[in-house]
Curated annotation (Swiss-Prot):
Record's protein name: THO complex subunit 3
Source species: Homo sapiens (Human)
Coiled coil: none
Gene Ontology cellular-component annotations: nuclear speck; nucleoplasm; THO complex part of transcription export complex; transcription export complex
Family, per entry: Belongs to the THOC3 family.
Phylogenetic lineage: Eukaryota, Metazoa, Chordata, Craniata, Vertebrata
Length: 351
């Protein structure tokens, strides 16, 4: 059964910095021109602003493909959609209908008006922001925790707590295929070419299936412990995985080899996001900061301070703006302010 990363303890490595790197990780010498340029940008754009979205903690944030809207899914059983106006998020609508927590959501890859939510109520719902209505409710067999939309827009894959992944036709809203796995399935994703399907699992492996045949292609031993999350870079060159060992590993898509690791976090890596140009990778955990690294060197580019563990991060598809949401469960902070907010980093300091 898939286990939320929040339930995991600190890294077995227990250290950050080069000393905790796996043997195959490499350290570069001196910051690149890109790193220096982005650091200069963030020095003037290091402001984080928070926006009230929900009445309980936010589990998932995602941008529409055109970057005009940000959606969030929450423990309060709703989704919210914001419009990005200059340097602020303006709440557009709240989407109700689920009977349990909205654990993950994603947008259609090329239609900026459609998004889909996965819930513990054993359904997924497709929403249209133009009508603000649910255009389809699809019943599934279990409590849903992971969802992704295929790059060609034709299929939605949803994973549940019982390690079943269901493939749903995005037009007919009917199940096309269903796979029961014998291992703990964590995050799921197609590759950018739409011809392979990737799963991260509780044994530290990345399982790759052909698509649409769903035949096993390869299993990669990526990490010594639970492999939690996976993201593909928009350029199609790399994918990254995050693990309970607190490491992020970067993989060459074509060669399926690990090219570098990022080891500045101490806790299980719960969420990853590549910037629109594929040059930055944000990773977050129960550490009270989000690490922003240069993809090509692994160098630290910036860190975003947080007051609590981070559930979800998402780079804007066109700008160096990072949306994220944190956990308020420890109650150390003013819960009325902290609960249910989405945060936006990269805003001008004088905004």
């Amino acid at each position: 059964m898939a286990v939320p990363a929040a339930a995991m303890g600190p890294s077995a490595l227990g250290q950050s910095g080069p000393g905790s790197m796996a043997p195959w990780c490499s350290v570069s010498s001196g910051p690149s021109r890109y790193v220096l340029g982005m650091q200069e940008l963030f020095r003037g754009h290091s402001k984080t602003r928070e926006f009230l979205a929900h009445s309980a903690k936010v589990h998932s944030v995602a941008w529409s493909c055109d970057g005009r809207r940000l959606a969030s899914g929450s423990f309060d059983k709703t989704a919210s959609v914001f419009l990005l106006e200059k340097d602020r998020l303006v709440k557009e609508n709240n989407y109700r209908g689920h009977g349990d927590s909205v654990d993950q959501l994603c947008w259609h890859p090329s239609n900026p008006d459609l998004f889909v939510t996965a819930s513990g109520d054993k359904t997924i719902r497709i929403w249209d922001v133009r009508t603000t209505k649910c255009i389809a409710t699809v019943n599934t067999k279990g409590e849903n925790i992971n969802i992704c939309w295929s790059p060609d827009g034709q299929t939605i894959a949803v994973g549940n707590k019982d390690d079943v992944v269901t493939f749903i036709d995005a037009k007919t809203h009917r199940s096309k295929a269903e796979e029961q796995f014998k291992f703990e399935v964590n995050e799921i994703s197609w590759n950018n070419d739409n011809n392979m399907f990737f799963l991260t699992n509780g044994n530290g492996c990345i399982n790759i299936l052909s698509y649409p045949e769903l035949k096993p292609v390869q299993s990669i031993n990526a990490h010594p412990s639970n492999c939690i999350c996976i993201k593909f870079d928009p350029m199609g060159k790399y994918f990254a995985t995050g693990s309970a060992d607190a490491l992020v590993s970067l993989w060459d898509v074509d060669e399926l080899v690990c090219v570098r690791c990022f080891s500045r976090l101490d806790w299980p890596v719960r969420t990853l996001s590549f910037s629109h140009d594929g040059k930055m990778l944000a990773s977050a955990s129960e550490d009270h900061f989000i690490d922003i690294a240069e993809v090509e060197t692994g160098d630290k580019l910036w860190e975003v301070q947080c007051e609590s563990p981070t559930f979800t991060v998402a780079w804007h598809p066109k700008r160096p703006l990072l949306a994220f949401a944190c956990d308020d469960k420890d109650g150390k902070y003013d819960s009325s302010r902290e609960a249910g907010t989405v945060k936006l980093f990269g805003l001008p300091n004088d905004s």
